[in-house]
Amino acid sequence: MSVVAAAVVPSSPMLVPDVATGAASELATLRVAADDAVARLTAAGAEVVVVLGSGPRAAYAHGSAGTFAGLGVPLRVSLGDDVGEPATLPLPLCIGAWLLARTRYAGLTAGVTVDGAWASPDVDVALLVVADGTACRTEKAPGAFDARAAAFDGHIAAALAHGDGAALRGLDAGLAAELHVGGLPALRALGALEGPWRAELLADDATHGVGSFVACWERA
């Protein structure tokens, strides 16, 4: 049993139109690419889709719920059917759950946040990685401008485009921290998966000064 396919999507809540409101059109291209990637992922025939994000290590079962209320939007999401569980999903997993709902995926779903290595369950898994690159691409970026950010994001994009797990594992953690790469643990967890992979980079963007990627990995 193994990870049979993976997709990477942005972790920005601005991907969700209800959150972005008047700025929703600014991420329209990323949103379309993310929908495409998730549709491919859910068609991979895995027994379970696992949504993976960065954060303190935790696991979330099918039916776990979350909300965007912390961003002023009373939008509730869940991993699979909403069975009324308390809203405990962290933001990256809320975004993953929202994207899965848009595809009308009705299969088994779970979630996990990682701060290091991740071991896949003993079933065939499709992995939805919710992660951004740097937050320093422009002066108005969340982390302000840093001239090193574009090159760092370029390394991420190249690794995603070529299914290069070693390149993801080798990303400089110290520099990533300086460039506010909150998605590094999730990207490294993806990189730790045994290949080879047939990969495609669907989007590479820096709207709002944040490195954002959409990619699909399938077993070669």
Language model: regions and residue ranges:
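Polyanion-binding loop/helix "lid" in catalytic or ligand-binding cores
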Residues: 37, 160-204
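Short Gly/Thr/Asp-enriched flexible loops that form oxyanion-binding sites at enzyme active sites
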Residues: 62-65, 96, 138-145
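A short aromatic-anchored loop/beta-hairpin motif
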Residues: 1-88
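Short, basic/aromatic-enriched C-terminal tail that caps enzymatic domains
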Residues: 208-220
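Conserved beta strand-loop-helix elements of the APE1-like EEP
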Residues: 100-104, 184-195, 215-218
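Active-site beta-strand/loop microenvironment that shapes enzyme catalytic pockets
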Residues: 113-155
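Cap/lid and interdomain-hinge subdomains that line or gate substrate/regulatory clefts
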Residues: 79-119
